Structures are given as structure tokens and as C-alpha cells.
Regions:
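Catalytic Zn2+-binding segment of zinc metalloproteases
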Residues: 304, 499-511
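Bacterial N-terminal signal peptides
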Residues: 7-18
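C-terminal substrate/ligand-recognition segments
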Residues: 491, 495, 568-586, 609, ...
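Active-site recognition of the HExxH zinc-binding catalytic motif
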Residues: 489-504, 525
Length: 633
């Protein structure tokens, strides 16, 4: 997943709890208000404290307001330079502060940062509304846009002008004063609901733990998974027990290997019921209200549905085109998944006490079928996927494809001890940018994996601003005297997010508002992910962590042969989530739906197998209800 600087401005404030927070610091002591004085002007994380954000955000918003006011006060005729470019270059301090705040809120949050997020969610929304609905500013933009045919603009300039004009029109600039006020109210409520949705989801995810007291209940689990459970128990002051959580490196191995079917069910139900427990953190009403407000906003802006509004600017263009594409994939995927289910059921039927396959059995029996059909035990592959070797493999692919060099820089500050920083150079040795890698689980880090930008490439006159990007993951770190050893899925995730990082590092544009369509940003990551398990690439980086021996060709062939194994399941769970997303966002009225009944209607319509749960259910579908992927997952 890619997080841009723009989306940081929109969503960095979405998770929160109340706690005391230092509101201010002496202006001359605020690191945001002066050059950092670090290599490549990277953030001096060790000098930035919670007390610096409030005054920095306040000053940054005021600074951008003044920049916008200056544009509207220009007495000369609106031009591309004095209006469009000036607006594009406004808000640099806000980008600077938001970039740092965003990476910390995602990767290593604290109660103080959460409190700042609570305060600034409505303030930032109001600030964005003030710019988007500024009548004087829009009239200047429109004046330039209306004479675009006479301006002899470059392709980049034309795209910036088009994007700027469309953003304002789509943001409500043409609405009446009364409708603009209604739009403000909708945007304000949506921002707070998104905040609450994410808050609830994190609470549900991070507070749950399955405590195992008997060692026999761990039968089947690999030693590394047992050790990780014991360490989690010690951290929870439950020595002598084992703790498993809803973090992916914990629950996935448990479902893959634990023989105890009852505990598999308990853990998987907890995962699938996040936000759906009728408690203080329930997200059902929130998701329904978000969907209804999006319909209201779309209607206000002249669109029949939220999906029509979103997709107009994406490559897909229309909801009908997306439905056609997804439905074309659905039936073949469902047929493959049914065959996979039948193979697992056949295996269960040979056991002493057979039973119907359930969703919490899928990972366990898929692993057994893979072992039987391909003689491949995924856990036995981990010793060949030491994190540092996998990352170097990704670097080497980028070196061969694009001539890049990656040099670790220990002189650049980080925000946590296990974060590493690399300077990226071109074939000629010229500086291209900076990459932070932050791969391991830690308290305060949100689930998942993502790429983001602290600074994007830009040109100001003859000066070039080089990018600073980061990759964040949630892999299990070094433990029990062993380095971090990745699963196949984590290997592909590392390559995937690195593809996003390469996009951020290598994209060159003269203006900020020239990003890719939302449904186009996944292409670089998919290209890079494709190389992760290529035989030639595997031979280059997959080496046993203890002996240094390269992965045997026999194992590579097993990986290749099993490459399409379980793809029916994977495709069905993804497509089910995509279709659920589209069903929510093709609603044409503001009636509040009963969330569980609504999604069940979707799953019944597409005939989703009961043995497979959608990749995301509505109460924890953060991509669409608090992220930037609504009508686009």
C-alpha cells in the first residue's frame, strides 16, 4: 500500500485516544521552523518531541492561509505562474510537519501523538475546506483554465492546470453558499467518523490475546511460533504460558499449523469479528453512516453515487466497468476455490473423525495439501529468507533494472533502533534519494505494510528537491538468537512495498499535484513483487542464515510448481472484499443500512463459499472506511 504526502494530510490524524499533551514549545526551539542541519535535510527525529507538533501545525496552516490569501490579493490578471504554480507550492511547512507526524503515528505512536491527532482532525478538515471552497481563489483558477488553449503550456503544466481545476470543481467550488456549508458539515462528520473507525479497529486488534496454558495445545506449531508465543506471554507478564494475537505474524502460523481445531476457531473468529462485538469499539453503525454521508456528498456534487464520483478520475472511469471486470474474474476464481475446498475435504474424510471444512480450517489443511502435493513445508523455507538477505535481493534487482546503488547511512537519524536508512544513488553515483526501512513488529505500530513519503521529488527554479521515502512492515523480528526469518508471503510483501518505494524515488515531476490515479499506483509494486520468487532472483539472495548455503534448486522448483497453489482461495477472498466495497459505494440513497445484513446480501448474491471469509468485513475494512481506497479496493 502506498501513502502519499497528500493522503497523510487527510488521514494521518485518524487514530486517537485522549491523554495529556504538551501544547507548545518556544518558537525558536521548534525543529520544524529552521533547516534541519542533517544529511539531505532528513528529519532530526531525536530533536522532535510531542510539544513541537501543535505550534508547528498551527503555524503551518496559518502560513498556507497567508500564501492562499496572497494569491487572491494579486491585482494583476491571473496567470499560470501567479495562481496555479503559486497554489501548488503553498503549504510546504504543512507537508513537512505532516510527513513526520504521519510516519510516527503509523509506526511508533504514543498517547501524546494520539491526543494531537484528536485536536487536529477537525482543524485540518476545516483548513482544507477553507482552501477548496475559497471563491476568490477558484475564480482565479477558473480564469486561467478558461484561457488554457492560448497559454502554450508544456504537457506537465497542462496536466497541473487540469488537475487543479478539476480538484476544485470536484471539491465543491461551484456549489451555492448553502450547499458549500452543507458540504463542510458532511466533510467534518466524515473526518471524525473515520477517526473513530480506526480508533476502534486498533483497540480491537491490539487488545485481543489468546492465552494458551497447556503445551499440548501447541501441537503442530513450529518451534519459532511457540517461542514467539512464549515471548509474547512474558511481555504480558504471563510467564509459563503462550500468547497469540491478531497480528499477522502471530495468527497466520497458528492457523497454518496448530492441531487444536477449537483454538483455531477461537482465534480466527476473534480476527473476523473485529469491530463487530457490540461493545464500545463496534464499527457497524460507523461504516453505515460513512457510506450514507458519502452518498449525500456525491449527490451534492452532482454524482449518483460515491463510486461514480471516485472512479471518474481513475483509470476504470465507471462503476459498471469495475463490476464487469470483477465479475469476469469471479466465476473462474470461485470454481478453482471449490476444487481446493474439495481436495481438503477429501483429506479430512480420511481422518478418524471427519467433519465439514470450516473457514478456520482452511489454512491448516491447505498447508497439509501443499505438503502432500508438492512436498513443500513453508516453515522449512524460512531459514533461507533472512530479512537482510531478502532486502538485499530487492536492492540487487533494482540495481540490475535501474542502475541503483543502496548505501546504508548510519549518520542519518531514525525514530527507532531497528530502523535502517539507505542513501540511493544512480549508476553515475549521483544522489537520488533516501529510503528508510522499518520492518519489525513493535508496540504502537499499526497493522499491515505500507510505503510513504516524507518528501517527494520536486523542482523549484533550478533547484532539485530529492525524495525521502519509507517502507514499513510488521514482520517478526530477531528472536531466540536467530535473525528475522521471513515467510514466503512476507518476502513478497517486502518486494511489493519496495516497488512502491522505487516509484517514489524515481518519479520526477516539476509540480506536486501530478500524481498517478489511485488505481494506477499499484503497478510498480506488482512489477517488483513479480521478481521476488523468480528462480534467478531466488538464487541470488536466498541463503541459509546459519550455513550461507544457497537455496537448493529442488526447493526453488517446489516453490515455482506451487506458485498457483491456493490461488482460488486468495483470489476469492480479495474479490469478495472488492465487490463489497463497490456495493457499499454504489448505493444511491442515504438510508442507513444494517451493516451485517448488507454485507451478507453481497456475499449471498455472489455465492461466496461459507468456507471462505471475505478478505475484509465491513467493521474492519479500514482501506475503504478510513483510508484512501473507497470504491477502489
Amino acid at each position: 500500500m502506498r501513502i502519499t504526502l497528500f493522503s497523510v494530510l487527510v488521514t494521518a490524524f485518524c487514530l486517537s485516544i485522549t491523554a495529556p499533551v504538551a501544547l507548545s514549545a518556544p518558537p525558536d526551539a521548534n525543529p520544524f521552523f529552521a533547516p534541519y542541519g542533517t544529511p539531505f535535510e532528513t528529519p532530526p527525529f531525536q530533536r522532535i518531541g510531542p510539544e513541537h507538533y501543535m505550534p508547528a501545525f498551527q503555524k503551518a496552516m496559518e502560513e498556507q492561509k497567508n500564501e492562499v490569501r496572497a494569491i487572491t490579493m494579486v491585482r494583476s490578471v491571473p496567470t499560470f505562474e501567479n495562481t496555479i504554480v503559486a497554489l501548488d507550492r503553498s503549504g510546504r511547512l504543512l507537508q513537512r510537519v505532516s510527513g513526520v507526524f504521519g510516519i510516527l503515528r503509523g509506526a511508533i505512536t504514543t498517547d501524546q501523538l494520539d491526543s494531537i491527532a484528536v485536536i487536529f482532525t477537525p482543524l485540518l478538515t476545516a483548513h482544507r475546506n477553507d482552501i477548496a471552497l475559497n471563491e476568490q481563489l477558484f475564480q482565479r483558477i477558473k480564469a486561467v483554465y478558461d484561457k488554457r488553449a492560448t497559454l502554450s503550456l508544456t504537457p506537465e503544466q497542462s496536466m497541473l492546470l487540469d488537475n487543479t481545476y478539476k480538484d476544485f470543481v470536484r471539491g465543491g467550488a461551484n456549489l451555492s453558499p448553502a450547499d458549500k456549508q452543507r458540504l463542510r458539515v458532511i466533510n467534518d462528520e466524515l473526518s471524525m467518523l473515520s477517526l473513530k473507525f480506526n480508533q476502534n479497529l486498533l483497540k480491537e486488534t491490539n487488545s485481543y490475546r489468546l492465552v494458551v496454558e497447556k503445551k499440548e495445545d501447541l501441537d503442530g506449531l513450529p518451534p519459532d511460533a511457540i517461542d514467539a508465543g512464549a515471548e509474547a506471554a512474558r511481555n504480558a507478564k504471563l510467564d509459563g504460558k503462550w500468547v497469540f494475537t491478531l497480528q499477522k505474524p502471530s495468527w497466520i502460523p497458528f492457523l497454518q499449523y496448530a492441531k487444536n481445531r477449537g483454538l483455531r476457531e477461537t482465534l480466527y473468529r476473534a480476527y473476523c469479528n473485529r469491530g463487530d462485538n457490540n461493545n464500545a469499539f463496534d464499527n457497524k453503525q460507523i461504516s453505515a453512516r460513512i457510506a450514507a454521508l458519502r452518498v449525500a456528498r456525491a449527490n451534492l456534487l452532482g454524482y449518483p453515487t460515491h463510486a461514480a464520483y471516485v472512479l471518474e478520475e481513475n483509470m476504470a472511469k465507471t462503476p459498471a466497468a469495475v463490476y464487469e471486470f470483477l465479475n469476469r474474474l469471479w466465476e473462474p476464481a470461485l470454481q478453482v476455490a471449490q476444487k481446493e475446498r474439495d481436495a481438503m475435504q477429501a483429506m479430512i474424510n480420511t481422518e478418524a473423525k471427519p467433519f465439514p471444512l470450516a473457514s478456520w480450517d482452511w489454512w491448516y489443511y491447505a498447508e497439509k495439501v501443499k505438503k502432500a502435493e508438492y512436498d513443500l513445508d513453508e516453515d522449512a523455507l524460512r531459514p533461507y529468507f533472512k530479512m537482510e538477505n531478502v532486502r538485499q535481493g530487492a536492492f540487487d534487482v533494482a540495481s540490475q533494472l535501474y542502475g541503483l546503488q543502496f548505501l546504508e547511512r548510519k549518520d542519518i537519524p531514525t525514530y527507532a533502533g531497528d530502523v535502517q536508512v539507505f542513501e540511493v544513488k544512480g549508476r553515475d553515483g549521483a544522489h537520488i534519494g533516501i529510503l528508510y526501512t522499518d520492518y519489525y513488529l513493535r508496540g504502537g505500530k499499526r497493522p499491515g505494510a505500507w510505503m510513504g513519503e516524507l518528501r517527494s521529488f520536486g523542482r523549484i527554479g533550478d533547484s532539485v528537491v530529492t525524495p525521502v521515502v519509507y517502507n514499513v512492515g510488521n514482520f517478526s523480528g530477531p528472536a531466540a538468537g536467530k535473525p528475522a526469518l521471513l515467510s514466503l508471503d512476507e518476502v513478497e510483501t517486502l518486494f511489493h512495498e519496495f516497488g512502491h518505494a522505487l516509484s517514489g524515488l524515481l518519479s520526477q515531476r516539476s509540480y506536486d499535484n501530478l500524481g498517478l490515479p489511485r488505481d494506477g499506483i499499484e503497478l510498480p509494486s506488482q512489477i517488483m513483487e513479480n521478481w521476488a520468487l523468480h528462480p534467478d532472483v531466488l538464487r541470488s539472495y536466498a541463503r541459509h542464515y546459519a550455513t550461507g548455503e544457497p537455496i537448493p534448486d529442488a526447493l526453488i522448483q517446489k516453490i515455482v510448481r506451487s506458485g498457483k497453489f491456493n490461488q482460488g482461495f486468495i483470489t476469492v477472498e480479495y474479490l469478495a472484499a472488492s465487490l463489497l466495497d463497490l456495493d457499499w459505494h454504489t448505493l444511491a440513497d442515504t438510508t442507513l443500512r444494517a451493516t451485517n445484513a448488507f454485507e451478507q446480501t453481497t456475499f449471498n448474491r455472489i455465492r461466496l463459499m461459507p468456507e471462505i471469509v471475505s478478505r475484509y468485513r465491513s467493521p474492519y475494512f479500514a482501506h475503504i472506511f478510513s483510508g484512501g481506497y473507497s470504491a477502489g479496493y
